[in-house]
């Protein structure tokens, strides 16, 4: 399920592939859809001293529930376990808004200043760039997209999160990607848990997206 990139390519895993012939066909179609989403929406151009990577997550909850969490630029702690507090400067939520995030103990940082680059409710795209903080993730930029899909005949959601970031002095590209991917993987796992809990509390029909 984790994708690792050393210089600009992609390796994306599928954690919802089924077994048997029908499962293989479905998995192939899902992989093709993921590749198209990445080509269209997740194009990064990492420099010589940067790394880029992408992760995917299949969530058993309808896209509107998942997107309601992902789009919460002012409340990332709704699903991100390492965020303890978030304040948006000025209070208004719009492109260019900046948030001050406090990070829980356990990560090599306590604060992060982040700017909203894109929030598209039609295409379900969120893009954020780190512009300050006491971390080492310089020029970090991420894109998160969510896409409706069917999982076991029920409304599900494919989430893709990609990023590009400078490689800190003293670290390799693989080390940098491994660290960032570990954090994103925790976030996506939590996103799935929260979304699926909300889906149980607010059941939808099989055709609702």
UniProtKB/Swiss-Prot annotation:
Record-marked site positions (Involved in interactions with PP2Cs): 108, 172
Nucleus in keyword set: yes
Disulfide-bonded cysteines: 51-177
Span of the annotated motif Latch loop: 135-137
Binding residue positions for abscisate: 80, 109-114, 136-142, 161
GO CC field: cytoplasm; cytosol; nucleus
Protein localization: Nucleus; Cytoplasm, Cytosol
Alphabetical list of Gene3D superfamilies matching this protein: 3.30.530.20
Matches recorded under Pfam families: Polyketide_cyc2 (PF10604)
Short motif (Gate loop): ranges: 105-109
Induction: Repressed by abscisic acid (ABA) and drought stress.
MF terms in GO: abscisic acid binding; protein phosphatase inhibitor activity; signaling receptor activity
One GO-annotated biological process of the protein: abscisic acid-activated signaling pathway
Site (Involved in ABA binding): 81, 180
Region span, START-like: 44-196
Signal peptide range in chain numbering: none
Matching PANTHER family: ABSCISIC ACID RECEPTOR PYL8, OS08G0374000 PROTEIN-RELATED
Complex and partners: Monomer. Interacts with PP2C30. Binding to PP2C30 is dependent on the presence of abscisic acid (ABA). Interacts with PP2C51. Binding to PP2C51 is dependent on the presence of ABA. Interacts with PP2C50. Binding to PP2C50 is dependent on the presence of ABA. Interacts with PP2C53.
Protein name as it appears in the record: Abscisic acid receptor PYL5
Organism: Oryza sativa subsp. japonica
Lineage of the species this protein comes from: Eukaryota, Viridiplantae, Streptophyta, Embryophyta, Tracheophyta
């Amino acid at each position: 399920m984790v994708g690792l990139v050393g210089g600009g390519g992609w390796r994306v895993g599928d954690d919802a592939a089924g077994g048997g012939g029908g499962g293989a066909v479905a998995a192939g179609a899902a992989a093709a859809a993921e590749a198209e989403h990445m080509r269209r929406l997740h194009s990064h151009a990492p420099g010589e001293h940067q790394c880029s990577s992408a992760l995917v997550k299949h969530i058993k909850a309808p896209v509107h529930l998942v997107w309601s969490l992902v789009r919460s630029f002012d409340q990332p702690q709704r699903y991100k376990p390492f965020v303890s507090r978030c304040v948006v400067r000025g209070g208004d939520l719009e492109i260019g808004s900046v948030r001050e995030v406090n990070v829980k103990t356990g990560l090599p940082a306590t604060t992060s200043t982040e700017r909203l680059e894109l929030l598209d409710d039609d295409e379900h795209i969120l893009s954020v760039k780190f512009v300050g903080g006491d971390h080492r993730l310089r020029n970090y930029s991420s894109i998160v997209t969510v896409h409706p899909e069917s999982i076991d005949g029920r409304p599900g959601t494919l989430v893709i999160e990609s990023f590009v970031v400078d490689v800190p002095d003293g670290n390799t590209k693989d080390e940098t990607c491994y660290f960032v991917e570990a954090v994103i993987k925790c976030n996506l796992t939590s996103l799935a848990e929260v979304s699926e809990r909300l889906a149980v509390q607010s059941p939808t029909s099989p055709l609702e997206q």
